[in-house]
């Protein structure tokens, strides 16, 4: 009995030793696996530190770029105010921080909260106003018994323009547009205040401008939604400048005496077309530079002998292309007596024929401007003989020598107003 108990105790001790050995083996194996995994991933901690450093550098770059942006915008503001030296200092500081800040900057101005930049309700700050005219009219009439188009910002002892009646103010606006149809000045005037914006959108002004351009062919504004849209979208010639084309070619000169040398000449000349709202047109072909010629085309009373005067009309054919037809001729001389004061001097004989030139042009748009290109489609000379009344027509081939005319706006043409619209 005692021997059996001893055998049982020995078996239990051997089982406990085996369990202890297995647990130690498992612990050693787990430690080995952990060490092995740490050896396989030695840079995991380094990657975390690298990502933190990259994030820190990115924040520093963003802060530096924001600082450079503020300095650059400050330099722009100082330059606009005339403080050139201060502007140079800010420009230099901005360029030292970010050399290419000029190309990264966004010039759109954010509204200033101190000056009422949030003129819309908070729920409408990011929503585009569909009908700005209706909105401004509502703002002016809201809470005002007597609507005023504008109010003076500072106190003044003189009479402010807001004291003028609406009819007088509209008459001033017609003077701004003038008989030259300077609608560009009207658009600039509408930027002054909300009241001027409303006056500049008056349909009668735009209707009068459309009637000056298209006459009886625009009695209805369909398919356009307004007279202003018709004036801006419908093809027309422009009056606030001149259409210019440049043609150049090379021709042979005369041979030298020894026959070994022949000169070559590069010939350049310009064509100018100036349109007026009353249907008149001036045409000039000359080798003179536009810097010299353009000021002479400001008035219809120009004294240049080479200028041809005439009239034009707009035509929209079935192919939906707008064409301009021009008829020009030399201005007739004033009638003088047959004999001058000196009996030995006769005046120049009356020409036996009259010459006129007929031009056909196709109106199109090129680049970012509208209606700024005229392409030649026809050019002919009509000679009418006084003795017989016969007219001879000579048509010219429209080839590459007839380069398109492009519009150039001339500020001096609309600098003064002679008559209201």
Curated annotation (Swiss-Prot):
Residues 11-20 have a biased composition (Acidic residues). GO terms for biological process: protein ubiquitination; regulation of TOR signaling; SCF-dependent proteasomal ubiquitin-dependent protein catabolic process. Residues 158-209 form the F-box domain. It is found in: Cytoplasm. CDD domains: F-box_FBXO9. Residues 54-63 have a biased composition (Basic and acidic residues). The keyword Cytoplasm applies. Gene3D superfamilies: 1.20.1280.50, Phosphotransferase system, lactose/cellobiose-type IIA subunit (1.20.58.80). GO terms for cellular component: cytoplasm; SCF ubiquitin ligase complex. Substrate recognition component of a SCF (SKP1-CUL1-F-box protein) E3 ubiquitin-protein ligase complex which mediates the ubiquitination and subsequent proteasomal degradation of target proteins and acts as a regulator of mTOR signaling. Part of the SCF (SKP1-CUL1-F-box) E3 ubiquitin-protein ligase complex SCF(fbxo9). This is F-box only protein 9. It comes from Danio rerio. The lineage of its organism: Eukaryota, Metazoa, Chordata, Craniata, Vertebrata.
